[in-house]
Amino acid sequence: MIMYNDYQNCRSNLNDEEMYGCGNCNLVVKSSDGTKNAYSIWLMDSNDYMNTPDGDFGYNCVHKDQIDWYEKRSKELADENGGKPVPAILFQHIPVQQEILELQEVAEMGENVVEHDGKFYSFGDKLISGRLREYPCPPYMKQDHTAQLKSWKKMGDVKAAFFGHDHVNDFHIRIDGISLYQTLGAGYFTYGEERGGRLIVLDENTHLHITIYHLCLKYEMS
């Protein structure tokens, strides 16, 4: 993180305030005339692994003090905006636990169906776009880590959240009015043959509409 901060156009920092993790920060995008906040961008550290009380091992999550900071800062922005939430997008590595909870068991393998522990799962008609190629890997499922998405719904600002972590998933689903996007891995040393990313276009005149371009290098370069 310190290395990235040395780059001229890096807009992140180690943390906006003292809290768990590294790189938790909020970036505000001004309107074209500079008179108001048009968009808010959240960068959250979803951390890496956790050791559980029962000696198990799993992926970590965004912690309570991080969520508390998000809610405090979100309210500050809303207060500056006449009490209305400033439309926001959010980025973090590990997806929210609710992704798994949206899966439904199906009878057999097929398109956008994945196998896990001998059973088959799909988003069914909840899949808006993209592909489900592997079972999502959210925070440790033996504990309840659903507070973060509930917090977004409570504050009313986050319109879309973007995750990595699952290297070959690139699906889009929506939960409680919030769009959740998985994005392909872009690095060299990872599994799967496809690499990609997303180009996000924000329009200050249409706060509720975000244009997403999904880019897959396998097809862009062929």
Residue ranges of model-derived segments:
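Short, surface-exposed, charge-dense and proline/glycine-enriched linear segments
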Residues: M50, V114-F123, Y191-R198
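Short catalytic/ligand-binding loop motif for oxyanion handling, primarily in non-cytosolic enzymes
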Residues: M50-T52, Q97-L101, D170-H172, T190
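Active-site-proximal beta-strand/loop segments in catalytic clefts of secreted hydrolases
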Residues: M44-N47, Q92-P95, G164-H167, T183-A186, ...
